[in-house]
């Protein structure tokens, strides 16, 4: 339990400063350009994102449906920041929406994909989230930045450890020259 709480605190710490300031910059841009409706939606999605992290970060398991609603809000923030450059391709079989996974499992994968890859209008970047026979799969092409940001690997290791602690199962990481894929085993709901 203490390890899970420590992982949660670390996750929240990773999100707060950098992500928050980037979000405020994106919001300021919307206001400056007088995109009032988009700015209001952005505020709603940002609020939902932080509320979800604070309220559910210490929860052990969430349904895939709850996690996808969070990702919808979280991804909107990135889509505004990377207008016409970043896309989320979500293909989830409805039968898995009631299955569970550790809370906030998708956030670090999306954050890492954005952090470590070049995202330009000439080469739009796609992050795929899909289900495959009881697994949740997050995949993205590898388009390394010319000047990569330093990586500690803590976010991915934290996810791996939390997953094993909470579910007793391991995630699978497939890292090739062209693609980065993480496969996470979903848990059937107990009836």
Where in the sequence are the language-model features?
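C-terminal end segment of the histidine kinase catalytic
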Residues: 189-191
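Two-component histidine phosphotransfer core
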Residues: 1-185
